[in-house]
A protein has these predicted regions:
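Positively charged n-region of N-terminal signal peptides that target proteins for export
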Residues: 1-4
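Bacterial N-terminal signal peptides
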Residues: 6-16
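Extended, histidine- and acidic-residue-enriched regions that form the cofactor-binding/catalytic faces
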Residues: 20-121, 125-142, 147-283
């Protein structure tokens, strides 16, 4: 994955050089034409890119969280990395993409081995610290390319915290109605379900084990998912909640492309949104 991202950035530099007949352009010049990956720069290349006009995109996807018996633990991370590549190719100028955060607030899945979560306050503080670190160099506009649902709660708190520092933070929200998803969905569910499995059949089909997919849609109860039929929360012996057997690559393609359009629209809205007021300067 990292090799692919490195090759993508190298290709952009090489293409620019070939079109001009000169050496590759400085990243600050390149940023005026395409989005760039922060992790592939040196600090002195990053310095001129991190300006008040820059939008910083930070992907967020769990690196180890259960997704039923048919999807990998790094499902959300793979999704975040995929959307990162799509933003890299299609985002407007002056967008810097930071490395993906692969830990977060996922308490609902801890009964399933391999799943990880940090506390709400840790998730909130982690985003705050990362954003403030980068804002120190100039940027005030940030977008979290979020692939989770439980992550929305700490992200909302972070947005409030950072606004007090004059920093704008917005994030992708998968709970908002998507007309394409609404049209294609045939069953309920919200986790490793028909929709998420369809997306992965399009994004990374080699990671999906459809032979192990099974309908698992018991009554939704307060709390997380549980393997115990008498336990608190929603009973799910598989770790999924929905019917992944209905998933298809074609549905996934339509839903993913709709999500990409939403992400790019969100980023453009971040570009033009009013910034929160800066705090008073201390005497």
């Amino acid at each position: 994955m990292n090799r692919l991202l490195a090759l993508s950035f190298s290709f952009l530099l090489s293409a620019t050089a070939l079109s001009s007949g000169n050496a590759p352009e400085h990243p600050a010049v390149l940023l005026e034409k395409v989005a760039v990956l922060l992790e592939k720069l040196t600090w002195d290349e990053a310095e001129p890119l991190l300006t008040p006009e820059t939008i910083v995109v930070i992907p967020l996807g769990a690196g180890s969280k259960e997704h039923g018996r048919h999807l990998q633990l790094n499902n959300d991370f793979l999704m975040a990395e995929y959307f990162k590549r799509r933003v890299l190719r299609a985002a407007p100028p002056n967008v810097v993409i930071a490395p993906t955060i692969n830990y977060g607030f996922y308490p609902a899945f801890l009964e399933y081995p391999g799943s990880t979560s940090v506390t709400l306050e840790t998730a909130r503080a982690m985003v705050n610290d990362i954003v403030r670190s980068l804002a120190h160099y100039g940027p005030r506009r940030f977008y979290i390319l979020n692939t989770g649902i439980s992550t929305l709660r700490p992200l909302a708190l972070s947005a409030e915290d950072l606004a007090k520092d004059g920093i704008l933070l917005r994030y992708l929200d998968f709970t908002k109605d998507d007309p394409v998803e609404k049209k294609l969905r045939r069953s309920g569910g919200t986790h490793a379900d028909e929709v998420e499995t369809s997306m992965m059949l399009y994004i990374a089909p080699e990671t999906v084990q459809m032979k192990k997919a099974a309908r698992d849609l018991n009554d939704n109860r307060p709390g997380g998912l549980t393997r115990d039929p008498k336990g608190k929360g929603t009973y799910s012996p598989t770790g999924a909640w929905g019917d992944p057997t209905l998933a298809t690559k074609e549905k996934g393609q339509a839903i993913v492309e709709s999500n990409v359009a939403t992400i790019l629209k969100d980023i453009e809205e971040v570009r033009h949104a009013a910034l929160p007021a800066l705090p008073p300067t201390a005497n």
